[in-house]
Every structure is written in structure tokens, then in C-alpha cells.
Curated annotation (Swiss-Prot):
Pfam families: Rib_5-P_isom_A (PF06026)
UniProt: substrate binding residues: 28-31, 83-86, 96-99, 123
Disulfide-linked positions: none
This protein's name: Ribose-5-phosphate isomerase A
Class in the EC hierarchy, top level: isomerase
Amino acid sequence: MNKEDLKRQAAARALDEVRDGMKIGLGTGSTAKHFVELLGEKVRAGLDVIGVPTSEVTRADAERCGIRLTTLDEIDRLDLTVDGADEIDPRLELIKGGGGALLREKIVAAASDRMIVIADETKWVDCLGHFPLPVEVIPFGLAATRRAIEQACAEVGASGRLQLREGKDGHAFVTDGGHWIIDAHLGRIPDAPRLAQLLSAIPGVVEHGLFIGIASTVVLAGTDGIRTVERA
């Protein structure tokens, strides 16, 4: 069984939590795409739900699958958000944003009663940081912002290369919100909650990919089956 099969299994398990009439946040990334496709099959079979996409890519996927969409300007709360993650630790703290949609993903997740994270077993780690941490930044004053990010990382005992993400054209990758992303290659983040606080306080940082205290449930698919972990 390959990794895509495992992702689809996790997505299918999360779909079991969806009920008629729900308002659902639709995540971004390869695993979340499986959920959108499976949800679309249920919608075509008569399930009545409405979704809020976390990126323009997900919006296009959902529309293609026939899922009715809205925005957080039209509704105030969501019943559920289903999204993937780049890393998950035992406290259900996450690194997200490898696909560049971290800002909208966090806004949508925070507006939800529950967040279910779906992933294959390789995303489960003892300590966050092996996957580069995305930090979404304003282009203005980039050098000053980069220095402040370095200082924040150092304060929690993390260090490594900070790299401006590039798009396929070789220029700076631009998010749906018009911002840039600095990827922090830290290897290990000893205190993710503290780093999240420090990054959020930096002028020039729009958002970061540390999701702390947001995920309610993690569904992990592996070669031995599916494991569900609830936040304590």
C-alpha cells in the first residue's frame, strides 16, 4: 500500500464524522484533496453540506467536485474542519503550511468547533522541526523580519537556515494573501508553544505554521491500520 492509499484511508475515516447540514472547513494539500474528492462523492449522492475552502486551489477542487461553498463572511462558525499536516507531535501540535496556505488554514480552523487532522503515519514525530517551519511575512522590511525570526528561534534553543521560498518561476513564492514565506529549517523545536508566541509578536510576520491547541483529533493511517488520537 502506497502513501496516497494511506492518505485516502485517513480521509475516508474523517468523512465518517460528517453529517447532513454541516458547515465544513476544507483543507489544502495532497491529503486534504482526498477528503474533498470523497466528500464530493457523498454530495453527489445526496449529502447536504456547505464548505469553506482554505485556498484558491481547494476552492477549484471543491467546485469541480460539486461541493457548495461559502465564506466566513457569510457564516460565523463551522462545525468541522478537515485538513492535513506536515508534522504532528504527541500533544497534537502541528507544523502546517508546506503548501503555502497556512494563514487561511489557521483562520478557518480557528473558526471551527472541531479540527480533524488527517495524515499518513510518517507525519507523526516525537518533536516538531524536521519539516521546515513556514513563516508568512510582509515583503517590506524582509531583512529586519528575518533577523527577528532568527532571534525568536534562538530564544527557544532552535537554529538553522532561513530560506525565502521560491515559486516555479524562480521568484519569491506569493501566497493567496499576497505575502511571502520564509521556511525555517530548524531540525528540532524544543518549545513549539513558546516559539509560536514569539513569532506572532514580530512586526512583519503575518502568520506562522505552528498550530498549537487547535487540532481536536488526528487520524493516522499506517500499514497496520488506522489510529485515532484525541487531544487530552
